[in-house]
């Protein structure tokens, strides 16, 4: 019989490991009194929002300044003594203790990478201690909804060394009957796309997130994706639609958007996006405008918010204060959820909850610098978010999340419901 003392935190260890770009990141391991343990590794981003929680790096020459030994030391020397003796079941208290110890507004005291690693590892240790899968521990008996994947098959912007301005062109197989079929559909289009690019004499090398990185214009990318969907035997807009991550903050300066050889005002940028929506089966646009262009976002929401899911990534940075500002101003209609933007599991769950109560969708997301950690797959099911964005159909750190979702779907059996089959995937908002 399980004793409550078995779930008390006994030891916390941390180490510096590598992410998918060969950069150091933080791994934490939480061991409980009863012998159960949980391990987690934090990701890192390339196109990071100015309002994200602080990722602590060492500086200096080692690893070109990107080492994380300071964050590791903070876990073992400051966080561990504060948390040992607390129950791993009380996630809120564990995270609150770390936030109090940090003492800053943006987690610069301990480092968001240190706090998040311990936060996620604690949840996994608690789940293991109870003998539950992580999605069930976090989500309870209602955790049965498998997410629609937003598959980043063409990479540009900060994620690839090519001339493509927009950062991500994604496949959205919302017309599948279940997650397994959605994954198959996306994979078949991915391989068809590779053949089409090869026939055009274009590069089929891949970017940070496993998608192809050819030298294409934004409209050319849309055209070749629609062609790949059709050639693979699917109906664009009906079975598989498109999603964009414009990452417009990356080319925004002095109130103008500079891309494709032009310079555009916020209103002109909205015009550009509307033209793309009119031409292609696009159902979701992420970061269509810059992170602090609130007036532009209001116009974008007015023009396209009923037709298209408008996702705030840099705009909201998984932060309830910024999300509440957007809700109050009727800006965007969806939030991208990145656990390392806010830096703790509790705050991540609070952001998802606020979005849901306000009629906003949530898209659970990876980062461009990923690892083999599959927490976000379980998180997507646990929160019934209905959508996950975890890269292309290549590179093991991306596929690991898809494979975990396959396992979860199998484990749920007849209880499993695919969000696309119930209309709970990407959508606009009246």
From Swiss-Prot:
The active site is at 209 (proton donor), 338 (proton acceptor). Gene3D superfamilies: Enolase-like C-terminal domain (3.20.20.120), Enolase-like, N-terminal domain (3.30.390.10). GO terms for biological process: glycolytic process. Mg(2+) binds at residues 245, 286, 313. InterPro entries: Enolase, Enolase-like_C_sf, Enolase-like_N, Enolase_C, Enolase_CS, Enolase_N. One of its GO terms (molecular function) is magnesium ion binding. Keywords: Cytoplasm, Glycolysis, Lyase, Magnesium, Metal-binding, Secreted. It catalyses: (2R)-2-phosphoglycerate = phosphoenolpyruvate + H2O. Its EC number is 4.2.1.11. It is found in: Cytoplasm; Secreted; Cell surface. Binds a second Mg(2+) ion via substrate during catalysis. Its cofactor is Mg(2+). (2R)-2-phosphoglycerate binds at residues 167, 338, 367-368, 389. Its main location: cytoplasm. The keyword Cytoplasm applies. GO terms for cellular component: cell surface; extracellular region; phosphopyruvate hydratase complex. Pathway: Carbohydrate degradation; glycolysis; pyruvate from D-glyceraldehyde 3-phosphate: step 4/5. NCBIfam families: eno (TIGR01060). Belongs to the enolase family. Catalyzes the reversible conversion of 2-phosphoglycerate (2-PG) into phosphoenolpyruvate (PEP). It is essential for the degradation of carbohydrates via glycolysis. PANTHER family: ENOLASE. This is Enolase. It comes from Synechococcus sp. (strain CC9311). The lineage of its organism: Bacteria, Bacillati, Cyanobacteriota, Cyanophyceae, Synechococcales.
């Amino acid at each position: 019989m399980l004793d409550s003392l078995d779930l008390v935190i006994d030891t916390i260890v941390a180490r510096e490991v590598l992410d998918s770009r060969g950069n150091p990141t933080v791994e934490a391991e939480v061991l409980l009194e009863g012998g159960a343990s949980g391990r987690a590794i934090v990701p890192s981003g390339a196109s990071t929002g100015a309002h994200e929680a602080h990722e602590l790096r060492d500086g200096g020459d080692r690893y070109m300044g990107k080492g994380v030994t300071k964050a590791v030391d903070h876990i073992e020397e400051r966080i561990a003594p504060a948390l040992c003796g607390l129950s791993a079941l009380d996630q809120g208290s564990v995270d609150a203790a770390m936030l109090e110890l940090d003492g800053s507004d943006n987690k610069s005291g301990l480092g968001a990478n240190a706090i998040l690693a311990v936060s996620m590892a604690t949840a996994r240790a608690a789940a293991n201690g109870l003998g539950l899968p992580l999605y069930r521990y976090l989500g309870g008996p209602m955790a049965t909804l498998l997410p629609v994947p937003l598959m980043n098959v063409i990479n540009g912007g900060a994620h690839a060394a090519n001339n493509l301005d927009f950062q991500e062109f994604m496949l959205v197989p919302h017309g599948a009957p279940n997650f397994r079929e959605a994954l198959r559909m996306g994979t078949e289009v991915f391989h068809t796309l590779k053949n089409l690019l090869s026939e055009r004499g274009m590069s089929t090398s891949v970017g940070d997130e496993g998608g192809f990185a050819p030298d294409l214009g934004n409209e050319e990318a849309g055209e070749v994706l629609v062609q790949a969907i059709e050639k693979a035997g699917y109906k664009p807009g009906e079975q598989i639609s498109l999603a964009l991550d414009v990452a417009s903050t990356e080319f925004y300066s002095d109130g103008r958007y500079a891309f494709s050889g032009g310079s555009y005002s916020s209103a002109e940028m909205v015009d550009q996006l509307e033209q793309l929506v009119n031409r292609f089966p696009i159902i979701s646009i992420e970061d269509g405008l810059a992170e602090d262009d609130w007036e532009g976002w209001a116009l974008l929401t007015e023009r396209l918010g009923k037709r298209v899911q408008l996702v705030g990534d840099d705009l909201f940075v998984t932060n309830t204060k910024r999300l509440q500002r957007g809700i109050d101003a009727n800006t965007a209609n969806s939030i991208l959820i990145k656990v390392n933007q806010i830096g703790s599991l509790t705050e991540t769950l609070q952001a998802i909850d606020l979005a849901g109560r306000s009629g906003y969708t949530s898209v659970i997301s990876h980062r461009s610098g990923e690892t083999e950690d599959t927490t976000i797959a379980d998180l997507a099911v646990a929160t019934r978010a209905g959508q996950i964005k975890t890269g292309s159909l290549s590179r093991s750190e991306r596929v690991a999340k898809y494979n975990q979702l396959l396992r979860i779907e199998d484990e749920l059996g007849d209880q499993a419901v695919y969000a696309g089959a119930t209309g709970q995937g990407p959508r606009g908002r009246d």
